[in-house]
């Protein structure tokens, strides 16, 4: 669950498996197995007993999210993205009124290439080889995880197997690689998520619901249109400074 964390793990058996170098805690919400090969690491991780704290969002499910969206559509107040003329009167005076509700679900970016990065950390410098859509954002994330100033960190942008925004807005995978490398100074660490990890721990396209009410004249021409949107903001998480008067222009422009 989002907001969950790591309680504990028992690596007494796993660290003795072939190829395993270390079993490490990574931040507050992940465990990594460092091994000679990726398959050895995955096999060991699958066998590792882990206790998770599922956090405050454990009760959140599809039904509760749907209820929040409906509540937003029915709320008395809302931020106004665009208003031209008196739409309420235009619809009230229409010969015919058409209403429709549309829904866009959460969707995983599902890039062809799962999240990955390679990192090498020393007390003097941190280097990261990272498939990224935003080198500046990647550098900021790497510097934060490395505990070093940005001018002592290098991010090498490499070819990526699909991005779709997932590798531009968030660099949690690069941060994880650095946090692992920081516990093994001087050792290059290649982090590669499994497809299952990539699907479960993605940052999804926001869920949105829109209610549209249109007024038509006797000839079927549109005389008024009112659109109400309820959903998760894109910019509030990615770049809140771009929000204007409570309006997420990415969501608003996508609707238009």
Question: Which residues does each predicted region cover?
Answer:
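Structural alpha/beta core scaffold segments of enzyme domains
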Residues: 1-256
């Amino acid at each position: 669950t989002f907001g969950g964390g790591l309680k504990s793990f028992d690596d007494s058996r796993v660290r003795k498996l072939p190829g395993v170098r270390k079993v490490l805690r990574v931040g507050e919400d992940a465990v990594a197995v460092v091994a000679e090969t990726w398959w050895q690491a995955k096999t060991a991780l699958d066998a590792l007993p882990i206790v998770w704290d599922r956090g405050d969002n454990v009760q959140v499910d599809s039904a509760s999210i749907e209820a929040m969206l409906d509540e937003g559509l029915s709320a008395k107040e809302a931020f106004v993205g665009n208003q031209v003329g008196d739409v309420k009167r235009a619809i009230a005076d229409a010969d015919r009124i058409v209403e429709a509700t549309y829904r866009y679900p959460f969707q995983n970016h599902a890039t062809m290439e799962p999240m990955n990065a390679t990192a090498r950390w020393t007390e003097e410098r941190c280097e990261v080889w990272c498939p990224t859509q935003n080198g500046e954002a990647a550098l900021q994330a790497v510097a934060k995880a490395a505990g070093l100033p940005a001018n002592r960190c290098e991010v090498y942008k490499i070819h990526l197997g699909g991005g779709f925004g997932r590798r531009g807005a968030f660099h949690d995978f690069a941060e994880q690689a650095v946090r692992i490398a920081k516990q093994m100074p001087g050792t290059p660490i290649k982090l590669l998520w499994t497809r299952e990890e990539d699907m479960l721990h993605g940052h999804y396209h926001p869920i949105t619901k829109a209610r549209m009410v249109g007024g038509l004249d006797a000839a079927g021409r549109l005389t008024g249109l009112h659109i109400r949107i309820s959903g998760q903001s894109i910019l509030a998480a990615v770049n809140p400074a771009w929000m204007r008067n409570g309006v997420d222009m990415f969501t608003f422009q996508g609707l238009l």
